[in-house]
Curated annotation (Swiss-Prot):
Organism: Saccharomyces cerevisiae (strain ATCC 204508 / S288c)
Pfam families on file: GATA
Biological processes, Gene Ontology terms: regulation of transcription by RNA polymerase II
Name of the protein in its database record: Protein GAT3
Gene Ontology molecular functions: sequence-specific DNA binding; zinc ion binding
Amino acid sequence: MNIKTLCHPEYKRISVESLLNPVEETIDCEKPHSQTKINTAKPISASLYVTTNNTAVVQHNVQKRKGVTRRCPQCAVIKTSPQWREGPDGEVTLCNACGLFYRKIFLVFGKDLAKRYFNEIKGVSVKRKVPKSLYGVTRTR
Protein backbone atom coordinates (compact mmCIF):
# COMPACT_ATOMS: atom_id res chain seq x y z
CA MET A 1 0.00 0.00 0.00
CA ASN A 2 1.48 3.34 -1.02
CA ILE A 3 0.59 6.96 -0.33
CA LYS A 4 -1.58 7.21 -3.46
CA THR A 5 -3.65 4.26 -2.29
CA LEU A 6 -4.13 5.82 1.13
CA CYS A 7 -5.19 9.16 -0.34
CA HIS A 8 -7.59 7.61 -2.86
CA PRO A 9 -11.07 9.22 -2.51
CA GLU A 10 -12.79 5.83 -2.11
CA TYR A 11 -11.11 5.33 1.26
CA LYS A 12 -12.81 6.84 4.27
CA ARG A 13 -10.85 9.58 6.00
CA ILE A 14 -10.36 9.03 9.71
CA SER A 15 -10.87 11.94 12.07
CA VAL A 16 -9.39 12.39 15.52
CA GLU A 17 -12.87 12.08 17.06
CA SER A 18 -13.37 8.67 15.47
CA LEU A 19 -10.10 7.49 16.99
CA LEU A 20 -11.01 8.77 20.45
CA ASN A 21 -14.60 7.49 20.44
CA PRO A 22 -15.12 3.73 20.02
CA VAL A 23 -16.93 2.94 16.79
CA GLU A 24 -18.00 -0.49 15.59
CA GLU A 25 -17.72 -0.76 11.82
CA THR A 26 -18.58 -3.67 9.56
CA ILE A 27 -17.19 -3.34 6.07
CA ASP A 28 -17.47 -6.09 3.49
CA CYS A 29 -14.44 -5.71 1.22
CA GLU A 30 -15.96 -7.76 -1.61
CA LYS A 31 -18.80 -5.27 -2.22
CA PRO A 32 -18.27 -2.02 -4.10
CA HIS A 33 -17.75 1.03 -1.91
CA SER A 34 -21.25 2.40 -2.50
CA GLN A 35 -22.84 -0.77 -1.07
CA THR A 36 -20.62 -0.95 2.02
CA LYS A 37 -22.58 -1.22 5.26
CA ILE A 38 -21.27 0.78 8.20
CA ASN A 39 -22.79 0.35 11.65
CA THR A 40 -21.77 2.84 14.28
CA ALA A 41 -22.03 1.69 17.85
CA LYS A 42 -22.68 3.58 21.05
CA PRO A 43 -20.86 2.41 24.17
CA ILE A 44 -23.22 1.05 26.82
CA SER A 45 -20.64 -0.36 29.20
CA ALA A 46 -16.97 -1.24 29.11
CA SER A 47 -17.71 -4.64 27.64
CA LEU A 48 -20.85 -4.24 25.51
CA TYR A 49 -21.64 -2.27 22.36
CA VAL A 50 -25.05 -2.15 20.67
CA THR A 51 -25.50 -0.76 17.17
CA THR A 52 -27.62 2.36 16.74
CA ASN A 53 -30.36 0.52 14.85
CA ASN A 54 -30.42 -2.32 17.46
CA THR A 55 -29.88 -5.00 14.83
CA ALA A 56 -26.76 -6.52 16.29
CA VAL A 57 -25.20 -6.88 19.69
CA VAL A 58 -21.44 -7.33 19.79
CA GLN A 59 -19.63 -8.48 22.92
CA HIS A 60 -16.14 -7.16 23.48
CA ASN A 61 -14.14 -8.81 26.22
CA VAL A 62 -12.11 -5.96 27.64
CA GLN A 63 -9.78 -7.27 30.28
CA LYS A 64 -7.27 -5.15 32.09
CA ARG A 65 -3.92 -6.71 32.71
CA LYS A 66 -4.05 -8.04 36.23
CA GLY A 67 -0.87 -8.66 38.12
CA VAL A 68 -0.30 -10.12 41.52
CA THR A 69 0.75 -7.56 44.10
CA ARG A 70 3.91 -8.81 45.79
CA ARG A 71 6.50 -7.45 48.19
CA CYS A 72 10.17 -7.86 47.33
CA PRO A 73 11.96 -9.20 50.45
CA GLN A 74 15.21 -7.55 49.39
CA CYS A 75 14.25 -3.91 48.79
CA ALA A 76 10.79 -4.00 50.45
CA VAL A 77 9.09 -2.44 47.44
CA ILE A 78 5.50 -3.46 46.70
CA LYS A 79 4.84 -3.98 42.99
CA THR A 80 2.25 -5.42 40.66
CA SER A 81 4.98 -6.20 38.17
CA PRO A 82 4.53 -9.23 35.93
CA GLN A 83 8.28 -9.91 36.07
CA TRP A 84 9.60 -11.53 39.25
CA ARG A 85 12.94 -13.29 39.44
CA GLU A 86 14.65 -16.07 41.32
CA GLY A 87 16.42 -15.08 44.52
CA PRO A 88 18.98 -16.60 46.89
CA ASP A 89 16.41 -19.00 48.33
CA GLY A 90 15.68 -20.44 44.89
CA GLU A 91 12.13 -19.11 44.75
CA VAL A 92 10.75 -16.47 42.42
CA THR A 93 10.43 -13.75 45.05
CA LEU A 94 12.65 -10.85 43.95
CA CYS A 95 11.46 -7.84 41.96
CA ASN A 96 12.96 -7.42 38.51
CA ALA A 97 15.72 -5.00 39.62
CA CYS A 98 16.85 -7.06 42.64
CA GLY A 99 16.61 -10.26 40.62
CA LEU A 100 18.87 -8.92 37.89
CA PHE A 101 21.36 -7.71 40.50
CA TYR A 102 21.31 -11.09 42.25
CA ARG A 103 21.91 -12.87 38.95
CA LYS A 104 24.88 -10.59 38.23
CA ILE A 105 26.43 -11.29 41.66
CA PHE A 106 25.60 -14.99 41.28
CA LEU A 107 27.36 -15.29 37.91
CA VAL A 108 30.48 -13.46 39.07
CA PHE A 109 30.93 -14.81 42.61
CA GLY A 110 28.87 -17.98 42.82
CA LYS A 111 25.83 -19.01 44.79
CA ASP A 112 27.33 -19.06 48.29
CA LEU A 113 28.83 -15.55 48.21
CA ALA A 114 25.80 -14.11 46.41
CA LYS A 115 23.44 -15.58 49.00
CA ARG A 116 25.63 -14.37 51.89
CA TYR A 117 25.87 -10.84 50.44
CA PHE A 118 22.13 -10.65 49.81
CA ASN A 119 21.43 -11.72 53.39
CA GLU A 120 23.79 -8.98 54.65
CA ILE A 121 22.09 -6.20 52.69
CA LYS A 122 18.52 -7.42 53.11
CA GLY A 123 16.16 -4.50 53.73
CA VAL A 124 18.96 -1.94 53.38
CA SER A 125 18.72 0.68 50.66
CA VAL A 126 21.80 -0.09 48.62
CA LYS A 127 22.87 0.84 45.11
CA ARG A 128 22.85 -2.18 42.89
CA LYS A 129 26.59 -2.27 42.20
CA VAL A 130 29.07 -5.02 42.85
CA PRO A 131 30.33 -4.26 46.38
CA LYS A 132 33.99 -3.44 46.93
CA SER A 133 34.03 -5.98 49.75
CA LEU A 134 33.65 -8.73 47.15
CA TYR A 135 36.46 -7.53 44.86
CA GLY A 136 39.34 -9.95 44.79
CA VAL A 137 37.16 -12.84 45.93
CA THR A 138 37.29 -15.84 43.64
CA ARG A 139 34.17 -17.56 42.46
CA THR A 140 32.94 -20.52 44.47
CA ARG A 141 30.61 -23.14 43.13
